[in-house]
Amino acid sequence: ADYLQLTRA
């Protein structure tokens, strides 16, 4: 899991 995907919610 990457932080970029996590912040694109």
Swiss-Prot record:
It is found in: Secreted. One of its GO terms (cellular component) is extracellular region. It comes from the Eukaryota. Keywords: Neuropeptide, Secreted. GO terms for biological process: neuropeptide signaling pathway. Belongs to the FARP (FMRF amide related peptide) family. FMRFamides and FMRFamide-like peptides are neuropeptides. This is Extended FMRFamide-2. It comes from Praedatophasma maraisi.
